[in-house]
Amino acid sequence: MPVIEINDQEQFTYLTTTAAGDKLIVLYFHTSWAEPCKALKQVFEAISNEPSNSNVSFLSIDADENSEISELFEISAVPYFIIIHKGTILKELSGADPKEYVSLLEDCKNSVNSGSSQTHTMENANVNEGSHNDEDDDDEEEEEETEEQINARLTKLVNAAPVMLFMKGSPSEPKCGFSRQLVGILREHQVRFGFFDILRDESVRQNLKKFSEWPTFPQLYINGEFQGGLDIIKESLEEDPDFLQHALQS
């Protein structure tokens, strides 16, 4: 079925409840600033038009424009896929690998057809990078990330947008005063930014401190380069009111 762009929470609720029926529903969370989302959009649209997916609903959700929906599923990074069936989350996937997405969708279709899926209810969902079903959790415990894998993941994250803020909570609901202040500074200077909620991923939270050689949060990255925490950003702006714009252009 063709991709449906979600414009508000009322439309989303209708399509995932009243109009859902027995259909499998794929939620694709994205933003306009994340480069990986641009390529995945084409893949998402192409797969939605395949005849074999005629009984699957594909919903495209801008995570920035639909913050209430993003917060409902605790989305902390994009691109992010969630596959649901009859109000139940079947699978989740964070990242921009088309092969993983296609494989995940096929698994869910087969699972629904066989009626043997193990699921989590939407009300109890903790939708976040690294959250899977119990079987997946066992695999993760056995296969911890190596330092090289962690650094590769962090490198992708700090480059996910030209300006990336690693904070506690979200811009609409910061979980600490320092994060709230830095969000305010970026908005005051009309800087468009991506964010990552470090409270949703303990691995990122702990390892980013080493990666940045900085012990506290929030942390601001511009063009993949660490700029500092709240105090450093304040000092930089006192010295140069156009610091943020200059850092973006460098």
Swiss-Prot record:
SUPFAM superfamilies: Thioredoxin-like. Residues 1-110 form the Thioredoxin domain. [2Fe-2S] cluster binds at residue 176. CDD domains: GRX_PICOT_like (cd03028), TRX_PICOT (cd02984). The keyword Iron-sulfur applies. Residues 113-150 are annotated as: Disordered. Residues 151-250 form the Glutaredoxin domain. InterPro entries: Glutaredoxin (IPR002109), GRX_PICOT-like (IPR033658), Monothiol_GRX-rel (IPR004480), Thioredoxin-like_sf (IPR036249), Thioredoxin_domain (IPR013766). One of its GO terms (molecular function) is metal ion binding. It holds the Pfam family Glutaredoxin. Residues 113-130 have a biased composition (Polar residues). One of its GO terms (biological process) is iron-sulfur cluster assembly. Residues 134-148 have a biased composition (Acidic residues). Belongs to the glutaredoxin family. Monothiol subfamily. Homodimer. Heterodimer with FRA2. Present with 11000 molecules/cell in log phase SD medium. This is Monothiol glutaredoxin-3. The gene is GRX3.
